[in-house]
Amino acid sequence: MAQVSMRDMLQAGVHFGHQTRYWNPKMKPFIYGPRNGVHIINLEKTVPMFNGALAELTRIASNNGKILFVGTKRAATEAVQAAALDCQQYYVNHRWLGGMLTNWKTVRQSIKRLKDLETQSQDGTFDKLTKKEALVRTREMEKLELSLGGIKDMAGLPDAIFVIGADYEHIAIKEANNLGIPVFAVVDTNSNPDGIDFVIPGNDDATRAIQLYVTAAAAAVKEGRSQQTATEEKFAEEVAAE
């Protein structure tokens, strides 16, 4: 079972919040107190909340659910992409385009355009174009890849989103709320925990802390996927035995 310990969190700096003057009073239940002008997050709250979130991610993945990892702030981009790919899930790590979930029909058309351009770049179509036109299409493809590359194979809305930085990704959270998609989010002391189904109180800026969250989430998803595979294999064996 994917779990994270208090020691893991301390070493990653999960407990360091923001300067006290930037706090959001709604985070008071999760704050231990101030130290040198910085709020310290109460890890005795965070540890069980995070491990509960991981257990739910495992359950969703075991039912063939799709998880969308979201982290577009600079400190999160690489870790979010690597974790999503590691557990064969989906990600947005560049910029959240308004309507990415709530206007999925339009997003799907953009994904189709991206896939068409990818095909053209590989089947020799680009070679038949003028240099200028080939360059225009290449740039369009690169731009679409940056925004949609992590969701181009998602084939429909996700069953949950795992967010690094509730404050930074408030648009993604609002869209998920509108559609009833469960939200798992790391919430720092300056953020609003409202609208988040699984709150993970913690530092959302430190690279090591972000690495800890997404690595654990990916492990939880992989565990769920392996449970699903085992269940399917057992069912196949039972059918064959009848």
UniProtKB/Swiss-Prot annotation:
**Entry annotated with the keyword Ribosomal protein:** yes
The UniProt entry's GO biological process terms, in alphabetical order, are:
translation
What family does this belong to?
Answer: Belongs to the universal ribosomal protein uS2 family.
Give yes or no: UniProt keyword Secreted: no
UniProt xrefs under CDD domains = RPS2
Q: Which NCBIfam families match?
A: rpsB_bact (TIGR01011)
Give me the Gene Ontology terms describing cellular component.
cytosolic small ribosomal subunit
Alphabetically list the UniProt keywords.
Answer: Ribonucleoprotein, Ribosomal protein
Which organism is this entry from? Answer: Mannheimia succiniciproducens (strain KCTC 0769BP / MBEL55E)
A single GO molecular function, which one? structural constituent of ribosome
Indicate what this protein is called per its UniProt record.
Small ribosomal subunit protein uS2
Q: Which PROSITE patterns match?
A: RIBOSOMAL_S2_1, RIBOSOMAL_S2_2
